Amino acid sequence: ARSIMREVQEGVSAFVEGLRFNIGLGVGDQVALMTFGGARFILVDWTGDLEQLKEGATKLRSRPATGAFLPDAVNDIAKDFAEREAARPVLVVVATDGIDYGSHHDYRRIVQDLRASYTLMYSVFIPTASRRLTLNWDSRERDALLSEGPRQTGGRRINLSGSQPVRDALISIQNELASQYVVTYHRPESPVPPQRLSLGVTRPNLTVRLTPRKPQ
């Protein structure tokens, strides 16, 4: 049988290892590892120590006696980023379709807070056989956040299917993070300032997403 938690552990470990070689954490760059089955729990607090993060990944466990509070956890992270004045905040959420017991926050407001803190959000969704039994209203709110958070911040949602490994999804996210470009431009003088900017690419089958850069 498929062990989802083992896959998540291996995927997060590979993601952390890739931070060393693919992205290269700079001085002051920090990563945290948190779970949200029930109240948010910090496995590894903000750190630049990748070995500590890899060890934390091995401690990821399912918490079957609790319900998920994903919207509240994402809301807390958005506040953390704002308070820390993070220069390049990125949030990667890995979630299954277990029961979500509700939230005190509307997903639309959470997405606004993510955008206000210039957070780039990705989500990896792992379906299970119990999905048809858990589509309550709160789960719909969670699903909306998993979709709209990435869409409105420049990330993307990855829905795993069949035996697709969690590791592959996380590595693909990491490759995108390592392939970002800063676009600068100068607009011509005009009595009416333009409201939109269009960016085109010539390479076929290439998708470009925008994440507004935090003002310096």
Q: Where are each of the predicted segments found?
A:
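Scaffold/interface architecture of coatomer-like assemblies
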Residues: 1-216
